[in-house]
Swiss-Prot record:
GO terms for molecular function: flavin adenine dinucleotide binding. The keyword Cytoplasm applies. This is tRNA uridine 5-carboxymethylaminomethyl modification enzyme MnmG. It is found in: Cytoplasm. The keyword Transmembrane does not apply. The gene is mnmG. Belongs to the MnmG family. Gene3D superfamilies: FAD/NAD(P)-binding domain, GidA associated domain, C-terminal subdomain, tRNA uridine 5-carboxymethylaminomethyl modification enzyme MnmG/GidA. GO terms for cellular component: cytosol. Homodimer. Heterotetramer of two MnmE and two MnmG subunits. NAD-binding protein involved in the addition of a carboxymethylaminomethyl (cmnm) group at the wobble position (U34) of certain tRNAs, forming tRNA-cmnm(5)s(2)U34. It holds the Pfam family GIDA.
Length: 625
């Protein structure tokens, strides 16, 4: 007899984990199926979490009640805040992970989660009736029934590893690929593309000459992704920086014909922002060297990840390359790098909830949707889990807008514009990045996480206390007048500021570019009384208030366009005067509102005007009828 669940998640990578946990935490009886229970939360590529934009996604997942932030906080070997010399909109955390410890911790979280079962099994078929998902069937014939299914298969769908002139069926890190499920999706009529990614060699730490490299330590202050973390890992391991050189490039040039990238062996499209070393050599042949970061894979292993040396060159050529790199001349290669090709769905086949348009109650998240990166996968996973549970429970779906979160930017880009290469989230993709900062992810999303039942009462009470403290401190500073005495003038002039002519409110003084919250306390002759994150919010919100308000005004304009809904079943062939390309793109994407329609590539302002007139005429006709 088939077992029954509310939601089934296929895959236990970074998307699958957040999907399964979100579904379970919303109260849905959830099953997670994975090819290998020992590879839950495996990091097949770089041993890190975070970075520009991506680190903010991790904070957003945490604010919604997800898991990635908490787990990396417990298992990292190093953490750094990036872009500290720039404005708050581009600051982000990046952590080096202990890969094995991360997996162990995440597996324990999953096993301990109420409402979540986990089972080893390979899904071969989707059980579908009348274009509605009903369950899944494994390769040994076991059936599991459910009201919703989330596919989070990463790079396993028809995966093929390529190394030199060798190509063989495989998932990442030489695991079993998923062939039958890939065939099943193609047979259902989904539009599929082939993408490619790669990984560099790993070398033995005992054989590296670190004296020829530059040390890259973590921050010497406690850092955390999760807003709940209170204990910090200060015993950190450094990374190391080295470079390729002319000799390295000569090895690549001599053997370029052996690279799967250039021999025609690889057909899939690779990631623009994480190219292989041979691709960097060809595309940037004027550069005398390229950075390589040596990243330990954990505290209890000698494996070191050579970040920046991703390659599909044969194993013997990889060894030759390593011999030319300062510090790695005598390094033992423990694992060779490789490229991997896999199937991905064209993401314009999805609704904003990540439900497929073709099959009702079937959701997809992660690399199957054309993205790259653990964080992008996890961000999609939590939203798919939230919405699959909502569908089963008859609750409202949840869609994050581009002004709500980087997760909203990511999903909107995918479903509206699609992608012809593995999609990487960048700060530059967000038009409201001053609103979507690392520091305010909790202020943006904790209310929603609480409404969804994924934030505890205790955590929500602490959050509300923080929010109240921020407001109270702003009001307090706005009620204190600073007099221009000699001591105050000296403090201001020491920072390069102009002297005060008259008294000024402390909050107004904080708006000056040279002033900080610390200096305001010094001027007021006060000591620190508030948590550092509260002080940070007071300073950022005050200094950037004008810019933030301008962004909020833009958001309001877009929201008015979002209120102009477009019927899902609108026949664009009946909309006169639309350009042919616009008509085709609109029919493919099926935008839910005018704002989304305006972001579709190939749809210009004239098309939007025509669409608006058509919709208004339709309303008038319905009223008259």
């Amino acid at each position: 007899m088939a077992q029954e669940y509310d939601v089934i998640v296929i895959g236990a990578g970074h998307a699958g984990i957040e999907a399964g946990l979100a579904s379970a935490r919303r109260g849905a009886k959830t099953l997670m199926l994975t090819i290998n229970l020992d590879n839950i939360a495996f990091m097949p590529c770089n041993p890190s979490v975070g970075g520009p934009a991506k680190g903010i996604v991790v904070r957003e997942i945490d604010a919604l009640g997800g898991q990635m932030a908490k787990t990396i906080d417990k298992t990292h070997i190093q953490m750094r805040m990036l872009n500290t010399g720039k404005g708050p909109a581009v600051r982000a955390l990046r952590a080096q992970a202990d890969k094995v410890l991360y997996q162990q911790e995440m597996k324990k979280v999953i096993e301990d989660e109420a409402n979540l079962d986990i089972m080893q099994g390979m899904v071969d078929d989707l059980i579908i009736e009348d274009d509605v998902i009903k369950g899944v069937r494994t390769n040994i014939g076991t059936e599991y029934w459910s009201e919703a299914v989330i596919i989070t298969t990463g790079t396993f769908l028809r995966g093929e590893i390529i190394l030199g002139n060798m190509k063989y069926s495989s998932g990442p890190n030489h695991q079993l690929p998923s062939i039958s499920l890939a065939d099943n999706l193609r047979g259902l009529g989904f539009e599929v593309v082939r993408f490619k990614t790669g990984t560099p060699p790993r070398v033995n730490a005992k054989t590296i000459d670190y004296s020829k490299t530059e040390i890259q330590p973590g921050d010497d202050v406690g850092r955390a992704f999760s807003f709940e973390t209170t204990e910090y890992i200060l015993d950190q391991l450094p990374c190391w920086l080295t470079y390729t050189n002319g000799d390295t490039h000569q090895v690549i040039d001599d053997n370029l014909h052996l690279s799967a990238m250039y021999s025609g062996m690889i057909k899939g499209t690779g990631p623009r922002y994480c190219p292989s070393i041979e691709d960097k050599f060809v595309r940037f042949n004027d550069k005398p060297r390229h950075q390589l970061f040596l990243e330990p894979e954990g505290r209890n292993t000698n494996e070191v990840y050579v970040q920046g040396l991703s390659t599909s060159l044969p194993e013997h050529v990889q060894r030759q390359m390593l011999e030319t790199i300062p510090g790695l001349e005598k390094a033992d290669m423990m694992r060779a790098g490789y490229a991997i090709e896999y199937d991905a769905l064209v993401p314009t086949q999805l609704w904003p909830t990540l439900e497929t348009k073709k099959i009702k109650n079937l959701y997809t998240a992660g690399q199957i949707n054309g993205t790259s990166g653990y964080e992008e996968a996890a961000g999609q996973g939590i939203m798919a889990g939230i919405n699959a549970a909502a569908r089963v429970q008859g609750k409202d779906e949840v869609i994050l807008s581009r002004s709500d979160a980087y997760i909203g930017v990511l999903i909107d880009d995918l479903i509206t514009k699609g992608t012809n290469e593995p999609y990487r989230l960048l700060t530059s993709r967000a038009e409201y990045r001053l609103l979507l900062r690392h520091d305010n992810a909790d202020l943006r999303l904790t209310d929603l996480g609480y409404e969804l039942g994924m934030i505890s009462e205790e955590r929500y009470a602490r959050f509300n206390e923080k929010r109240a403290m921020i407001k109270a401190e702003q009001e307090r500073l706005n009620g204190i007048r600073v007099k221009p005495n000699d001591r105050v003038q000296e403090i201001i002039e020491a920072q390069g500021g102009s002297r005060l002519k008259d008294g000024i409110l402390a909050l107004e003084l904080l708006r000056r570019p040279e002033m900080t919250y610390d200096l305001i306390l010094e001027i007021l002759d006060e000591s620190h009384q508030l948590p550092s994150d509260v002080e940070e919010q007071v300073e950022i919100q005050t200094k950037y208030e004008g810019y933030i308000n301008k962004s909020l005004q833009q958001v309001e304009k877009v929201k008015r366009m979002e209120e102009k809904k477009i019927p899902e079943d609108l026949d664009y062939s009946k909309v006169d005067s639309l350009a042919t390309e616009a008509r085709e793109k609109l029919a493919e994407v099926k935008p839910l509102n005018i704002a989304q329609a305006s972001r579709i590539s190939g749809v210009n302002p004239a098309d939007i005007s025509i669409l608006l007139v058509y919709l208004e005429q339709g309303k008038i006709q319905r009223v008259n009828n």
